Design a protein with these regions (language model features):
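Nucleotide/phosphate-binding catalytic cleft detector across ATP-hydrolyzing
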Residues: 6-82
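Glycine-rich phosphate-binding loop of actin/hexokinase-like ATP-binding domains
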Residues: 18-33, 67, 77-133
Length: 133
């Protein structure tokens, strides 16, 4: 299971309140082993199947980012790479197999156009073309 720290805390029954106020401390970064059935997967998987819960980097860089880094192979690559996850929040990780730097910031205001003076909000026509090279 991979999710942000708040969602993971809620699913596992861990109090998420400390995540909502400074200094944004997680109760734990390594989650307990759980049965998949306890996560609502009874009848879908074997009754004794264990669920793997990906650990979080911190309060705003959760297990979903850990899972993404592992899936992308960034943790095994000698080249410096950039991993970006844009949603309500934006998490960015820069690094390679030897080091990783992670940060997070709210992305909603950027898409909503809050207090913009130039350009436009995220709407039809905001992006004219995207080229991958």
């Amino acid at each position: 299971m991979a999710g942000n720290a708040t969602m993971t805390h809620l699913v596992l029954g861990i109090d998420p309140e400390p995540l909502g106020m400074a200094p944004f401390i997680m109760a734990t970064r390594l989650y307990p082993e759980v049965l998949a059935a306890d996560l609502g997967l009874a009848g879908i998987v074997h009754p004794r199947a264990r669920a793997v819960v990906f650990p979080a980097f911190g309060a705003y860089v959760g297990g979903d980012i850990t899972a993404g880094l592992l899936a992308s192979g960034m943790d095994r690559d000698a080249r410096v790479r950039l991993f970006v996850d844009i949603g309500t929040n934006c998490e960015i990780v820069l690094g390679n197999r030897d080091w990783l730097l992670a940060t997070a910031a709210p992305a909603g205001p950027a898409f909503e156009g809050a207090a913009i003076r130039c350009g436009m909000r995220a709407a039809d026509g905001a992006i004219e073309v995207v080229t991958m090279t």
